[in-house]
């Protein structure tokens, strides 16, 4: 009787000491009854931005999403009216292009606004408006990077064009051709030296960051489009347009500028 109790106690203790990550089923007999001990695996919480229950582009009013948009990838809100992602190869290519253009747009939006912000706060480094800055190369003194002649000084638009084509063409050609430098790395999220802050160490946090990057990137692409339209319509930079709107919202807004192009006005 005592031996049986010791064996049962030892069996229960060994089971309790098993790691919580293991899925274990032990069966024993106690007092003529059948006892099953089971330890289940703790499920990993999933991000709300992925899977079939993720937010859709029209919220609860969204229609049935296409079967190929399963929520597997970041930024998938189930919207593809034109069917651009129906082909898997095209879908993969479009995902890559969107991430790359998002990153360029975020850098571009910063470059379009930051010089104006500095200029408004008394920092002088030449032309602050983004679409006017390049024209300084045609001036007598040429173009100084950040207004400092000791950094990069340029006076030839042809030289700038040639350097841009050669450098960017080489880099893009290398990327598209799949050079050996990036072997073994994810083409969109290489990590390592490209993640010095180790932001992608936690997989769950990394999946959230992918979504945030695309959301901000899409907003930046729309912003860049708006900056181009503003430059054509008003001839001013985005910060100056913002200041004008805040000073007189009625006279300076998209509607008032659009009506200037009405025939007969």
Swiss-Prot record:
Q: Where does chlorophyll b 5 bind?
A: 164, 261
Instruction: Give a Pfam family name.
Output: Chloroa_b-bind
Q: Name one GO molecular function term.
A: metal ion binding
Where does the UniProt entry say this protein principally localizes? plastid
How is this chain modified after translation?
A: Photoregulated by reversible but rapid phosphorylation by STN7 of its threonine residues under state 2 (red) light conditions. Dephosphorylated by PPH1 in state 1 (far red) light conditions. Phosphorylation triggers the formation of the PSI-LHCII supercomplex.
Cofactor: record remark = Binds at least 14 chlorophylls (8 Chl-a and 6 Chl-b) and carotenoids such as lutein and neoxanthin.
Q: Where does chlorophyll b 3 bind?
A: 156, 172
Q: Where is the transit peptide?
A: 1-37
Residue sites binding chlorophyll a 2 per the record: 101
State what the entry records as the consequence of deleting this gene.
In plants silenced with microRNAs, functional LHCII thylakoid protein complexes where LHCB2 is replaced by LHCB1. However these LHCII complexes are impaired in light state transitions, leading to stunted growth in high light. Reduced reactive oxygen species (ROS) production in leaves and impaired stomatal closure in response to abscisic acid (ABA). Increased water loss and reduced resistance to drought, probably due to open stomata. Altered expression of other LHCB members.
Q: Which residues bind chlorophyll a 3?
A: 136, 146, 213
Residues the record lists as binding chlorophyll b 1: 57
Q: How does it sit in the membrane?
A: Multi-pass membrane protein
Phosphothreonine modifications at? 40
- Which residues of the sequence carry a binding annotation for chlorophyll a 1? 79, 85, 98, 218
Q: What are the transmembrane regions?
A: 151-171, 219-239
Subcellular location per the Swiss-Prot or TrEMBL entry: Plastid, Chloroplast thylakoid membrane
The entry marks the following residues as binding chlorophyll a 6, namely 245, 254
Q: What induces it?
A: Accumulates at stronger levels in low light than in normal or high light; more expressed in growth chamber conditions than when grown in the field. Repressed in leaves exposed to desiccation, cold and high irradiance via a metalloprotease-dependent proteolytic process (at protein level).
Annotated residues that bind chlorophyll b 4 are located at 164, 175
Describe its partners and assembly state.
The LHC complex consists of chlorophyll a-b binding proteins. Component of LHCII trimers made of LHCB1, LHCB2 and LHCB3 subunits. Associated with super- (PSI-LHCII and PSII-LHCII) and mega-complexes (PSI-PSII-LHCII) containing LHCII and both photosystem (PS)I and PSII, in state 2 (red) light conditions.
What biological function has been recorded for the protein in this entry?
A: The light-harvesting complex (LHC) functions as a light receptor, it captures and delivers excitation energy to photosystems with which it is closely associated. Mediates rapid phosphorylation and migration of LHCII-PSII to photosystem I (PSI) after transition to state 2 (red) light conditions, thus leading to the formation of PSI-PSII-LHCII and PSI-LHCII supercomplex to balance the relative excitation of PSI and PSII. Involved in the production of reactive oxygen species (ROS) and stomatal closure upon abscisic acid (ABA) treatment. Required to prevent water loss.
Name listed for the protein in its UniProt record: Chlorophyll a-b binding protein 2.2, chloroplastic
Species per Swiss-Prot/TrEMBL record: Arabidopsis thaliana
Q: What is the lineage of its organism?
A: Eukaryota, Viridiplantae, Streptophyta, Embryophyta, Tracheophyta
């Amino acid at each position: 009787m005592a031996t049986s109790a010791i064996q049962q106690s030892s069996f229960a203790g060994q089971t309790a000491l098993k790691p919580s990550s293991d899925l274990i089923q032990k069966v024993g007999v106690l007092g003529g009854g059948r006892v099953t001990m089971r330890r289940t695996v703790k499920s990993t919480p999933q991000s709300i931005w992925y899977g079939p229950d993720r937010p859709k582009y029209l919220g609860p009013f969204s229609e049935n999403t296409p079967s190929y948009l399963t929520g597997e990838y970041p930024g998938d809100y189930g919207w593809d009216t034109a069917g651009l992602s129906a082909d898997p190869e095209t879908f993969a290519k479009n995902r890559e292009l969107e991430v790359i253009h998002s990153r360029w747009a975020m850098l571009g939006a910063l470059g379009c606004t930051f010089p104006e912000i500095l200029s408004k706060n008394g920092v002088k480094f030449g032309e602050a408006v983004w679409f006017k800055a390049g024209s300084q190369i045609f001036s007598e003194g040429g173009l100084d990077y950040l207004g400092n002649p000791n950094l990069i000084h340029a006076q030839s638009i042809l030289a700038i064009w040639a350097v841009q084509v050669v450098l960017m063409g080489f880099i893009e050609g290398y990327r598209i051709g799949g050079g050996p430098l990036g072997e073994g790395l994810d083409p969109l999220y290489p990590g390592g030296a490209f993640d010095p802050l180790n932001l992608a160490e936690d997989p769950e946090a990394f999946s959230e960051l992918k979504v945030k990057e695309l959301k901000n990137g899409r907003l930046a692409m729309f912003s860049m489009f708006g900056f181009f339209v503003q430059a054509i319509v008003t001839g001013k930079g985005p910060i100056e347009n913002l200041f004008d709107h805040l000073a007189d919202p009625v006279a300076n807004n998209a509607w008032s500028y659009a009506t200037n192009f009405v025939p007969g006005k």
